A protein has these predicted regions:
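Short internal beta-strands
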Residues: 349-357
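Glycine-rich, proline-tolerant flexible connector loops at the mouths of alpha/beta enzymes
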Residues: 325-330
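Shared catalytic-loop signature of beta/alpha-barrel
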Residues: 333-337, 350-351
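Short amphipathic alpha-helix used as the core "switch/output" element in two-component signaling
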Residues: 340-342
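ATP-dependent carboxylate/acyl-activation modules
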Residues: 1-197, 201-323, 335, 344, ...
Length: 395
């Protein structure tokens, strides 16, 4: 469950972390009223994804009339599938430096990792690629939490490649001890998967302020945070009343399908998580980009296959679909009937590549061939074929 920026900042403020003064607006008039109170403000779309600025979802305005106009524009937007239902209007900051401070769950080590960088305002994943020396990490003991000397060491390690901060490094490290401890406590209390401040702004006066925030709660712990879940639902960007859910994943849940939306253009359907993951890898190896992960599970009926194909093709970015089936309790003839029915019922004209092996494989292949769908004989062959048919090129 992903919180909106303003919801994350409210939690930061309650934990004692400084945030800019702001007001939530659901109408252009409310944004104008916020500008009357606060003066020069940033009007920021409240959607649970990044890239708002590039999409035109953030505007800095000087007057109430400008705030009204920009709020009207932003509230009419749909950013990567998320309709903008509210804007956060907050005072601007004078910036001396932009830092990054985040806490996320390291599943391999089974504990939180605290990440600090002087390259704030950028995607931390990109910083890790372009300038890994600017990132420092700390894995605190889960029982003791981050100790002061550990955070100071983290801070100095992160500032080692930032000569502009050298004169104020000691004071900054001391302040980071306080903020990091508070952020960590908040992450634990809220069962967070990610708790991030980016950028953490250092003002010319030396104050650290959370200029943007990201907070994602473990869905398995939602029962412990009923009030927060209810609050998030009120500002939901998803049709099922939950904020932060990808609209395609929302639809898949309604259909009872195990589906993860990705950024590519080749739809992928498999049976079993391992086989489906392997199918994604094969598509990537042959130069394609998967649009999704969809596992139909064992013993899937023709109806379930039909449902899965319909789900995958709801994504307008999908140029073709790769169906990869290993027949154990899943029968090849049932899969073939589902694929054929979906093609005919939905009028599918995009490329379909089907690879199946195992139970009722020969019957399934016969049905596909009679319907004009040529099945692939191996998974690598199928992956290569769908990549070619969808106009992708190998690296």
């Amino acid at each position: 469950m992903k919180l909106l920026e303003y919801q994350a900042k409210q939690r930061f403020a309650s934990a004692g972390i400084a945030v800019p003064d702001g007001r939530l607006a659901r109408t252009p008039d409310e944004a104008a009223a916020a500008a009357e109170q606060l003066g020069r403000i940033a009007v920021k779309a409240q959607v649970p994804i990044g890239g708002r600025g590039k999409a035109g979802g953030i505007a800095v305005v000087d007057t109430p009339e400008d705030a009204r106009r920009e709020a009207a524009r932003i509230l009419s937007m749909d950013i990567r599938g998320y309709p903008v239902r509210s804007v956060w209007c907050e005072t601007g900051l004078s910036i001396a430096s932009e830092l990054y401070l985040g806490i996320t769950l390291d599943r391999d080590r089974r504990r939180f990792v605290i990440i600090f960088s002087t390259a704030g305002g950028m995607e931390i994943e990109q910083v890790a690629v372009d300038a890994p020396e600017k990132i420092a990490k700390l894995w605190p003991d889960p029982f003791a939490g981050p100790l002061a000397f550990e955070v100071r060491h983290l801070a100095f390690a992160g500032m080692a490649h930032a000569p502009a901060l050298r004169d104020r490094a000691a004071k900054l490290a001391a302040e980071l001890v306080t903020i990091t401890t508070r952020l960590y406590t908040l992450a634990v209390q809220l069962d967070a998967l990610t708790c991030e401040i980016n950028p953490l702004v250092l003002t010319p006066e030396g104050q650290l302020v959370a200029a943007d925030g990201k907070l994602e709660i473990d869905e398995n712990a939602e029962y412990r945070h009923a009030e927060l879940v209810a609050e998030v639902a009120r500002d939901s960007a998803g049709d099922d009343g939950r904020t932060g859910d990808d609209p395609f994943e929302v639809e898949a849940r309604k259909r009872g399908l195990t589906y993860v939306h990705l950024d590519g253009n080749i739809g992928v359907i498999g049976n079993g998580a391992g086989l489906t993951m392997n199918t994604l890898d094969l598509v990537k190896q042959h130069g394609g980009e998967p649009a999704n992960f969809l596992d139909i599970g064992g013993g899937a009926s023709a109806e379930r296959v039909h449902n899965a194909l319909e789900m995958v093709l709801l994504d307008p970015n999908v140029r073709g679909v790769f169906v990869n089936i290993f027949g154990g309790i899943t029968r090849g003839d049932e899969v073939a009937r589902g694929v054929i029915a979906a093609r005919d019922d939905l009028g599918i004209t995009k490329p379909l590549v089907v690879r199946m092996t195992g139970t009722m494989e020969e019957e399934g292949r016969r049905l596909l061939e009679e319907a004009g769908i040529v099945p692939a004989t191996s998974a690598p062959e199928a992956a290569e074929k769908i990549v070619q048919l969808t106009g992708n090129s190998a690296p």
